[in-house]
Amino acid sequence: MFILNLLLYIIPILLAVAFLTLIERKVLGYMQFRKGPNIVGPYGLLQPFADAVKLFTKEPLRPLTSSILMFILAPILALSIALTIWTPLPMPNSLLDLNLGLLFILSLSGLSVYSILWSGWASNSKYALIGALRAVAQTISYEVSLAIILLSVMLINGSFTLKTLSTTQENWWLIITTWPLAMMWYISTLAETNRAPFDLTEGESELVSGFNVDYAAGPFAMFFLAEYANIIAMNAITTILFMGSSLTLNLTHIDSITFMMKTLLLTMAFLWVRASYPRFRYDQLMHLLWKNFLPLTLALCLWYISLPIALSCIPPQL
């Protein structure tokens, strides 16, 4: 039974990731006035499966000078963390009902840094190492703003439990009442998942392919799956935090559909941003966080600390 539960939890995520790659190629294609994949299957719908078969049947090569154990463990760790992040998410029911769900998510997103660092170092390539160091600096930096924004949301919510956020947002979504936080959170998630315009780790023009330059076949596919699973997970977390309750009178299946639609909308915005904006320069990326986001998030956090004290408020779910 446990294995069945695990499979029913992992397979839909991997299917969603597979079709996200197809949607991305289609959306980017239409935005650039071309068709995108349309050969394999009707309207190119079987393209992700063809890619998966091709990648997993090829021989996994590795550089002679690489560190074998770390080189193999890095993609496995990346995919494991990307799948584990989903466990506490209420959609509307979660696999693990954690009281400290948000801390769990924050800790796991911090752990993903190690897989990138291992892959860059174990490849024994200067391009991979530079890409990995960029990724680590970027991820750790933007986690600071993510943590402070989460703290502000938790001060409004009154607990670290994700399920209570739907009660908090019964009247108004937090994306309306705390829009500066939501805006900074969304931009920080773009940086956290290494997406354009913050994709400095995979800068093709300067670093060939970044930290995964020496990976091929299966291990490369695992990094690819981890990246896209993280994108969907981050947008699901954004939906829970800022676009919570759907007011459907406990109709679980309708709740799930509305949750899915909101997450899809945010994911499409990720693709739109990728198609629209050029890559940031590295110093601009760091200045955006340390000189703009950090002072703003700290000021807003202090505001949300002082507001309940000044108005003698109690958490919404009590």
Curated annotation (Swiss-Prot):
One of its GO terms (biological process) is aerobic respiration. Keywords: Electron transport, Membrane, Mitochondrion, Mitochondrion inner membrane, NAD, Respiratory chain, Translocase, Transmembrane, Transmembrane helix, Transport, Ubiquinone. Its EC number is 7.1.1.2. InterPro entries: NADH_UbQ_OxRdtase_su1/FPO (IPR001694), NADH_UbQ_OxRdtase_su1_CS (IPR018086). One of its GO terms (cellular component) is mitochondrial inner membrane. It catalyses: a ubiquinone + NADH + 5 H(+)(in) = a ubiquinol + NAD(+) + 4 H(+)(out). The chain crosses the membrane at residues 3-23, 68-88, 100-120, 136-156, 172-192, 222-242, 253-273, 294-314. It is a multi-pass membrane protein. It comes from the Eukaryota. Signal peptide: none annotated. It is found in: Mitochondrion inner membrane. GO terms for molecular function: NADH dehydrogenase (ubiquinone) activity. Core subunit of the mitochondrial membrane respiratory chain NADH dehydrogenase (Complex I) that is believed to belong to the minimal assembly required for catalysis. Complex I functions in the transfer of electrons from NADH to the respiratory chain. The immediate electron acceptor for the enzyme is believed to be ubiquinone. Belongs to the complex I subunit 1 family. This is NADH-ubiquinone oxidoreductase chain 1. The lineage of its organism: Eukaryota, Metazoa, Chordata, Craniata, Vertebrata.
